[in-house]
Curated annotation (Swiss-Prot):
Cited Pfam families: HORMA
Organism the protein comes from: Mus musculus
PTM text: Phosphorylated at Ser-375 in a SPO11-dependent manner.
Name this protein carries in UniProt: HORMA domain-containing protein 1
Lineage per the UniProt record: Eukaryota, Metazoa, Chordata, Craniata, Vertebrata
Subunit structure, as described in the record: Interacts with HORMAD2. Interacts with IHO1.
Length: 392
């Protein structure tokens, strides 16, 4: 019975992430699935759609939720259609970046409260990862096993981060913006379900914090995920789990092209491997959260003998210890609920000061965005942006 269950779990895992990635087509299918899993995990753990909008899959022994079309949940069905449009642009090698944004005012989708940035890279011969070994005839040394382990590590990071962020407001909306490699994308191209859009005047509602969640390389693609969220949603996280260094970054950097410049001012989101030995026969035992570290990232420099940006030791430990993540529904569906430590009078005063600070931040960012856009018009060509024809 146990053997049959293990075989079933392995087959379900292979359905999500194939065991072998040796062709460009296999890599494309892998990246599509990784994007679907990432978006599904984020929306599930942030409680954006109801439970019925998700199916269940397994990555090794990690259970993940996959978004599906549900006629009783128009929002989830709409997001699935957006994903199909992303697949079209990805398959044509046009897609450069996806920004999935959360906003709270249905009449103002340009003022966002949280966003997730997915980036893809290509070469003229097709998509290829960043890390190339010069002494191997320009062929990547990344194996399928490395890619799969990096993928599971990324999903684990998403789980840990989403579980520990403060909850979103009860009523939120989603929007999506697609950016392209304009030099190869036809000027009249639009993915199914999308139309011409722009990112001018986009502002962040609050004080943003930036996190580099991670990236997954294949022999043909590089998939990268970054998160921008309200700083206050991180302030209540246990300091032993998440340790941010003070770093001020303007919101406009989310739209930058050059990763080596952009990454200098973002925070790394690293999982430290501080784990206890487990009983060999312990199945789904009670689990502890791994320590997280949010620190300023240095400019990446890849030496000739250097492996991809994931540590083999770190990945091996994390992949083999799946029970270190708590994926209980009570914690993941709505975020942690933090109790205020202030008395009523002080709490009311604190809320007023927070509102005043947010108002001043919004006014400041509106001014900054306007100045930056006007000053860059003569230097930078305006990039094409697509947005959904219908919002959730």
């Amino acid at each position: 019975m146990a053997t049959m269950q293990l075989q079933r779990t392995a087959s379900l895992s292979a359905l999500v992430f194939p065991n072998k990635i040796s062709t460009e087509h296999q890599s494309l299918m892998f990246v599509k699935r990784l994007l679907a899993v990432s978006v599904s995990c984020i929306t599930y753990l942030r409680g954006i759609f109801p439970e019925r909008a998700y199916g269940t899959r397994y990555l090794d022994d990690l259970c993940v939720k996959i978004l599906k079309e549900d006629k009783n949940c128009p929002g989830s069905s709409q997001l699935v259609k957006w994903m199909l449009g992303c697949y079209d642009a990805l398959q044509k090698k046009y897609l450069r970046m996806i920004i999935l944004a959360v906003y709270t005012n249905p009449g103002d989708p340009q003022t966002i409260s949280e966003c997730y940035q997915f980036k893809f890279k290509y070469t003229k011969n097709g998509p290829i990862m960043d890390f190339i070994s010069k002494n191997q005839n320009n062929k990547s040394s990344t194996t399928s096993a490395d890619t799969k382990k990096a993928s599971i590590l990324l999903i684990r990071k998403i789980y840990v981060l989403m579980q520990n962020l403060g909850p979103l407001p009860n009523d939120v909306c989603l929007t999506m913006k697609l950016f392209y490699y304009d030099e190869v994308t036809p000027p009249d191209y639009q993915p199914p379900g999308f139309k011409d859009g722009d990112c001018e005047g986009v502002i962040f509602d609050g004080d943003p914090t930036y996190l580099n969640v991670g990236e997954v390389p294949t022999p043909f693609h590089t998939f990268r995920l970054k998160v921008t969220t309200e700083k206050e949603r991180m302030e209540n996280i246990d300091s032993t789990i998440l340790k941010p260094k003070e770093s001020k970054t303007q919101f406009e950097k989310i739209l930058m092209d050059k990763d080596d410049v952009e990454d200098e001012n973002h925070n790394n989101f690293d999982i430290k491997t501080k784990m206890n030995e487990q009983n060999e026969n312990s199945g789904a035992s009670e689990i502890k959260e791994p320590n997280l570290d949010c620190k300023e990232e240095e400019t990446m420099q890849f030496k000739k003998s250097q492996s991809p940006s994931i540590s083999h030791c770190q990945v091996e430990q994390l992949v083999s210890k799946t029970s270190e993540l708590d994926v209980s529904e009570s914690k993941t569906r709505s975020g942690k609920i933090f109790q205020s430590k202030m008395v009523n009078g002080n709490n009311q005063q604190g809320q007023t000061s927070k509102e005043n600070r947010k108002r001043s931040l919004r006014q400041f960012r509106k001014t900054v965005l306007h100045v930056l856009e006007s000053s860059q018009e003569s230097v930078l060509k305006k990039r094409r942006v697509s947005e959904p024809k219908e919002h959730t």
